[in-house]
Amino acid sequence: MKVIKYYNNKDVRLDDDLKPQIYSKEILVKVKKSGICGSDVLEHYRLTKMKKLGVPYLVLGHEIAGDIVEVGKDVTDYKVGDKVFVSHHVPCFDCHYCRQGHQTACELLHNTNFDPGGFAEYVRIPAVNIEKKGVYVLSNNISYEEGVFIEPLGCVCRAQRLANVSKGQTVLILGSGVSGLLHLQLAKIRGANKVITTDVNEYHIKMAKQFGAEAVLYANTDISSIIKDINDEKLPDVIIVCTGAVSAAKQAIQCAGPGSKVVFFAVPGPGVNIEIPINDFWRNEVTIMTSYGAAPIDLDMAYNWLLAKRINVIDLITHRLPFSKAQEGFNLVSEAKDSLKVVLEPDEIQDN
């Protein structure tokens, strides 16, 4: 079968590999669509992992939708022909962190994956992913392309659930890429009175306006002052950081007012520290929080929003490319110019 091998952001190759063989409690999925996530192009993170594992390349890809083509003899809940989304990470539900509601901090979740990765024609789904409810049979009303968004939208659902984004709030979203525009849509659904977004990219700014932001600001301006001018002299209730730029992290701190919640949905690279005016935050009861990944409850929410057609994900797809043009796709995502979501698919699908 064909797989996409990642050596670094500028060296992504289509190559041959063995088709995975499944065991009795596993399933084999033929990939139809696979999205490139922003985390796939976090080069420092990927190279560190490769060094730790002692391997020259990785087969990435975790936003997949496809069809079950083989089922192990002991699998009872799924059948050949099912159209599915598969979660690459699953929590155990039993550990201390899971019981406390921190499923994405679960050790099992951080160590589960499918084989080899979503940028392959076929992926083997291990028994644990099946047992822990990581396989979702998709309704006929959800396309493969929509299925690709269950995981990234699930991450967004988790962040806003933890921050309790709710009716009447002003929400500031720093970064108007794919995750920022998903946050924009969900915040409006959850009842936010005003959603303000920022970016430095003209295309992203245009898209944020198209998706209904009440205000779209250039990130290289004094956004805290502008927000006060358009928000009755108040700073945002919720601030969601959707870019790893250090400047955005600093802006998030600067834009926090009385009662604000600052959610780091994305963070700068390792070793970066941000100064916190802790005395001001103490007297104003500012909350700083992080959100990582998606738990099953969040994936369920994402699935239901997509099923109800409340979240527009199709218009976030700017490029549909065959596996053979994976390098072009990685360039588009890493450079983040006139693009949003890039979806890859096996060449035979493109040819048909």
Language-model regions, residue ranges each:
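Short Gly/Pro-enriched turn/cap motifs at secondary-structure boundaries
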Residues: Y7, L18-K19, V55-G61, N111-G117, ...
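Glycine-rich beta-strand-centered segment in the early N-terminal region that forms part
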Residues: P20-S34, T48-R99, Y136-S139
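Short glycine-centered segments of the SAM/dcSAM-binding site in methyltransferase folds
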Residues: K83, T170, S260-K261, T287
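NAD(P)H dinucleotide-binding glycine-rich loop of Rossmann-like/cofactor-binding domains
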Residues: C92-L174
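Mid-domain Rossmann-like dinucleotide-binding core that forms the NAD(H)/NADP(H) cofactor-binding site
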Residues: N140-T221
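Glycine-rich cofactor phosphate-binding loops and adjacent beta1-alpha1 units
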Residues: A163, K206, F211-E285, Q327, ...
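C-terminal hydrophobic helical "lid"/dimerization subdomain
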Residues: K250-Q254, P296-N352
